[in-house]
């Protein structure tokens, strides 16, 4: 009888159940299982390719759209960038009002524009450094004519020898009176080899004086030596050629001289010119070979 009453009570209240000892055990609510089943169904629907588009758009990453600036906006932004590369918040807001853009867009544009400006500055500095080191590394040393345009390889000897003495002025003048002392004691005289080379030309034409062109060719003669003075010396002195040669040797570019060699050369030159100098002989009838000494004295014209 009691067992039947208990079974009826269990049937009426299914939430309670008695064990063998008579202790009740609460049962789990059914709505919890239903919520878990609902969440599992949502995950399955989201994982399936044919799920709802709203659930897929939430999980996808939002893509940023590129801003396309008009020519008026770019002109205004560039003009402001030339004045101020780091605008503050208020300036950016004013620019945004002028250009019909948002402050965030203006801030991003200035950031990108500064990055481009720095990149251009670095590239220009690299080009300048490369250009400055290209010449020493590529050609090692630039050509000599480019570094020193006033000096060339062809005109070194004339500049080294002729101009220093040709431009020098002497306090005395050359004439027929003082040519002799200058010939005996020249101020500048060449070595014996050069003096010996001038001997044949002087001995070949005794009594003649080389012209001013010849004197300039020998040693770039001094400007004080006039042609008239040389010609007058040639007429008055039989050794005018030797004096002229010695005077030409005096203007030679050799500063250092050997007095012994110069004096010997001048003495040899004078001796050769004196030997070549001779008076014209009187031409008469040849003496007869058979005449006696007395007849030869009578027959010879007086």
UniProtKB/Swiss-Prot annotation:
Ranges annotated as DNA-binding: 62-121
Motif Nuclear localization signal location, chain numbering: 268-272
Domain of life: Eukaryota
GO cellular component, one term: nucleus
Major localization class: nucleus
Location relative to the cell: Nucleus
Modification sites for Phosphoserine: 52, 57
Disease tied to this entry: Anterior segment dysgenesis 1: A form of anterior segment dysgenesis, a group of defects affecting anterior structures of the eye including cornea, iris, lens, trabecular meshwork, and Schlemm canal. Anterior segment dysgeneses result from abnormal migration or differentiation of the neural crest derived mesenchymal cells that give rise to components of the anterior chamber during eye development.
Record-stated family: Belongs to the paired homeobox family. Bicoid subfamily.
Subunit-structure text: Interacts with SFPQ.
Name of the featured protein: Pituitary homeobox 3
């Amino acid at each position: 009888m009691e067992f039947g009453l208990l079974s009826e009570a269990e049937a009426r209240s299914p939430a309670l159940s008695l064990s063998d000892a008579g202790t009740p055990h609460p049962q789990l609510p059914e709505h919890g299982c239903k919520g878990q089943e609902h969440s599992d169904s949502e995950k399955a629907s989201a994982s399936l390719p044919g799920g709802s588009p709203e659930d897929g758009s939430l999980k996808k990453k939002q893509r940023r759209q590129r801003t396309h600036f008009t020519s008026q906006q770019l002109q205004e932004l560039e003009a402001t960038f030339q004045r101020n590369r780091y605008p503050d918040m208020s300036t950016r807001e004013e620019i945004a009002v002028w250009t019909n853009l948002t402050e965030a867009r203006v801030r991003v544009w200035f950031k990108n524009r500064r990055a481009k400006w720095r990149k251009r500055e670095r590239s220009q500095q690299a080009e300048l450094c490369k250009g400055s080191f290209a010449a020493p590394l590529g050609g090692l040393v630039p050509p000599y004519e480019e570094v020193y345009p006033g000096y060339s390889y062809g005109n070194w000897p004339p500049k080294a020898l002729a101009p220093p003495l040709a431009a020098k002025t002497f306090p005395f003048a050359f004439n027929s009176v003082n040519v002799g002392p200058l010939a005996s004691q020249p101020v500048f005289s060449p070595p014996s080899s050069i003096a010996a080379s001038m001997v044949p030309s002087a001995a070949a034409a005794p009594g003649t004086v080389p012209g001013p062109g010849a004197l300039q060719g020998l040693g770039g003669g001094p400007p004080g030596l006039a042609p008239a003075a040389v010609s007058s010396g040639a007429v008055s002195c039989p050794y005018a050629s030797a004096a002229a040669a010695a005077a030409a040797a005096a203007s030679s570019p050799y500063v250092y001289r050997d007095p012994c060699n110069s004096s010997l050369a001048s003495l040899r030159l004078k001796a050769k010119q004196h030997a070549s100098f001779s008076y014209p002989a009187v031409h008469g009838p040849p003496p007869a070979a058979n005449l006696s000494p007395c007849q030869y004295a009578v027959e010879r014209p007086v």
